[in-house]
Curated annotation (Swiss-Prot):
Principal location: nucleus
Region forming the signal peptide: none
Expression across tissues: Highly expressed in skeletal muscle and at a lower level in heart.
Annotated compartments: Nucleus inner membrane
Start and end residues of each stretch annotated as Disordered: 15-80
Organism lineage string: Eukaryota, Metazoa, Chordata, Craniata, Vertebrata
UniProt protein name: Protein ATP1B4
UniProt membrane topology term: Single-pass type II membrane protein
Length: 357
């Protein structure tokens, strides 16, 4: 490269005036100047730009060095570093020089506690006042809002899982738990207990009791003997031993509820789906298959302490055997809703009888 530069800069003849022997100093100076120019040109020519691959490799090396430095900086602290951290933490918890706990003095803590005490005390006082005012407007005896109370729901006894009564007449173990459930449920309806606690009311009319809402109300008698063949007094097995089961139905209590138009609510049972002849005979007790008006209205559990919910017993005396029979019992009366699709207990109840022999 140097030879090429010299050949470009040198004249065509071999000997130049710069190398004349008659002026050696000037020749040397010119020679040095030429050498410097040649070196600069050679440096400019010989500097080759780096390729992209080389630049990427250098960048990767720099990144690796930076990562190593960061890892070294984030490594496990030495014993002195741990000791310094413990000292800082202990000083934060308690600084004996400035007598500070958690970076606060005793006066600062006292002010904070005092502020929070008054804040929460005021909050509790406001809540207490609101609750007291609310309870002044609510009667514990009669519900304030009853417009959206649903019509009476119904429930049956004895209790059966998924409302499926499945038993074998010849195997007492399959129906004995139904008998035990009915006996336990009817203990509060014993004649002696009803005569002692409740009064004998005339049938066919409401038992309305005037007076203050906090006065105790009397309740009408509903004796166990009213259920006759389904009372468990004549047949201790409630018909389950003969394949003629008894099922009791009651309405849920609603404060102030009265059957409309003075007509008692009646009960009617039939096959829900399938052959209607699967149930050929049903006996009801009381014989009217209704809830007498004398048990209404209901005044609430605080004043109507001895109130006994009236019952209607369904005695399935002739039901097809050895197959599942879906049964639907509905309430019939003015203002009673019994066709709610999404609630199977409003005004009706659906259960299954499967009596095996």
């Amino acid at each position: 490269m140097r030879r090429q530069l010299r050949s470009r800069r040198a004249p065509s003849f071999p000997y130049s005036y710069r190398y004349r022997l008659d002026d050696p100093d000037e020749a040397n100076q010119n020679y040095l100047a030429d050498e410097e120019e040649e070196a600069e040109e050679e440096a400019r020519v010989t500097v080759v730009p780096k390729s992209e691959e080389e630049e990427e490799e250098e960048e990767k090396e720099e990144e690796e060095e930076e990562e190593k430095e960061e890892e070294e900086g984030q490594g496990q602290p030495t014993g002195n570093a741990w000791w310094q951290k413990l000292q800082i933490m202990s000083e934060y918890l308690w600084d004996p020089e400035r007598r500070m706990f958690l970076a606060r003095t005793g006066q600062s803590w006292s002010l904070i506690l005092l502020i929070y005490f008054f804040f929460y005390a005021s909050l509790a006082a406001v809540i207490t006042l609101c609750m007291y005012t609310l309870f002044l407007t609510i009667s514990p005896y009669i519900p304030t809002f009853t417009e959206r109370v649903k019509p009476p729901g119904v429930m049956i006894r004895p209790f059966a899982h998924s409302l499926n009564f499945n038993f074998n007449v010849s195997e007492p173990d399959t129906w004995q738990h139904y008998v035990i459930s009915l006996n336990g449920f009817l203990q509060g309806y014993n004649d002696s207990l009803q005569e002692e606690m409740n009064v004998d009311c005339p049938p066919g009319q409401y038992f309305i009791q005037d007076g203050n809402e906090d006065e105790d109300k009397k309740a009408c008698q509903f004796k166990r003997s009213f259920l006759k063949n389904c009372s468990g007094l004549e047949d201790p097995t409630f018909g389950y031993s003969t394949g003629q089961p008894c099922i009791l139905l009651k309405m849920n209590r609603i404060v102030g509820f009265r059957p409309e138009l003075g007509d008692p609510v009646k009960v009617s049972c039939k096959v829900q789906r399938g052959d209607e002849n699967d149930i050929r005979s049903i006996s009801y007790y009381p014989e009217s298959a209704s809830f007498d008006l004398r048990y209404y209205p209901y005044y609430g559990k605080l004043t109507h302490v001895n109130y006994t919910s009236p019952l209607v017993a369904m005695h399935f005396t002739d039901v097809v055997k050895n197959q599942a029979v879906p049964v639907q019992c509905q309430l019939k009366g003015k203002g009673v809703i019994n066709d709610v699709i999404n609630d199977r207990f409003v005004g009706r109840v659906i259960f299954t009888l499967n009596i095996e022999t």
